[in-house]
């Protein structure tokens, strides 16, 4: 785990403009600042970039936490920043979602969820490394919010031409980086596990996790 933290820090810290991949649903990265980030009323407080392009959205949900106990560790309560899916399509959002991955060394990674779905995260030619985080035990379960599917096949006559549609606001790697407003986040969007608003004057940690799992029928492949 320490080696992965070091690699991520080297890629992202001090405005390096590097890139990391979060993998499939639930994969996450946590950021810690050298100062608290104030919740400025009436303004966005965070700007988080990804590598989204038109029809290539891979939205990640943002969570925030305040270092209440002052120990410098992300072990205080976490709160999700509510995004547009909670307004535009709440009936299609799966809250309290759970997915479990099983280690199969250097092979496709099988998974099951609490919605009676199953599939595999397929290996591809672009990423040769082990897909399962070997510093964690198998089985590995992630819990969170599952956003509505954003993949649309625009191919004709049986052709495959998948587009990943963007949500209106509130997610990382959802809109191109030149959309400053679309990649900015308000700490005032924070909600608790019951989706009730939470008042935070400042935060010390930010977490981004991948919030989709697409299943390609009939192969049950995931991406």
Locations of regions flagged by a protein language model:
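A Trp-anchored, charged/polar loop motif used as the substrate-binding/catalytic surface
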Residues: 180-196
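Residue-level detector of conserved catalytic or cofactor/ligand-binding positions
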Residues: 213-219
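Short beta-strand-plus-loop segments that form exposed binding edges in beta-rich domains
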Residues: 208-212
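Acidic, glycine-anchored loop motifs typical of Ca2+
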Residues: 68-77, 93-95, 101
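Short N-terminal edge-element motif at the start of the domain
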Residues: 2-67
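Low-complexity, serine/threonine/proline-enriched polar segments
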Residues: 84-179
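Extracellular Ig-like/FN3 beta-sandwich strand-entry sites
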Residues: 201-203
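Extracytoplasmic, non-cytosolic globular domains
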Residues: 57-64, 72-86
